[in-house]
């Protein structure tokens, strides 16, 4: 991917949810909501504070993150869908 986010922005690829329930029922595309979990694929350098210092982002490439339903801006790059969002849009990191 040839896109580098600026400042405190992060690029996230949504994690696809299963199309079958645990009971074996198929969930059609029209009934599924977009997942609110994804993987960080790129991070910016950090946010510049009022004092002029750059404060680094607490996330790194590969982190699994949770975000709000309406967080970020959707973009399509090289045939894939991504979200560009600010660090503040991230609700938490899923620990392994």
Swiss-Prot record:
It is found in: Cytoplasm. SUPFAM superfamilies: GroES-like. GO terms for molecular function: ATP binding; metal ion binding; protein folding chaperone; protein-folding chaperone binding; unfolded protein binding. GO terms for cellular component: cytoplasm. Gene3D superfamilies: GroES chaperonin. Keywords: Chaperone, Cytoplasm. GO terms for biological process: chaperone cofactor-dependent protein refolding. Together with the chaperonin GroEL, plays an essential role in assisting protein folding. The GroEL-GroES system forms a nano-cage that allows encapsulation of the non-native substrate proteins and provides a physical environment optimized to promote and accelerate protein folding. GroES binds to the apical surface of the GroEL ring, thereby capping the opening of the GroEL channel. HAMAP family: CH10. Belongs to the GroES chaperonin family. Heptamer of 7 subunits arranged in a ring. Interacts with the chaperonin GroEL. This is Co-chaperonin GroES.
């Amino acid at each position: 991917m040839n896109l580098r986010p600026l400042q405190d922005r992060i690029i996230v690829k949504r994690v696809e949810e299963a199309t079958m329930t645990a009971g074996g029922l198929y969930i059609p595309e029209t009934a599924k909501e977009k997942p609110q979990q994804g993987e960080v694929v790129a991070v910016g350098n950090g946010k510049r504070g009022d004092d002029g210092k750059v404060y680094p982002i607490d996330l790194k490439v590969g982190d699994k993150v949770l975000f709000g339903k309406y967080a970020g801006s959707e973009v399509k790059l090289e045939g894939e869908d991504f979200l560009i969002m600010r660090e503040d849009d991230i609700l938490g990191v899923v620990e392994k």
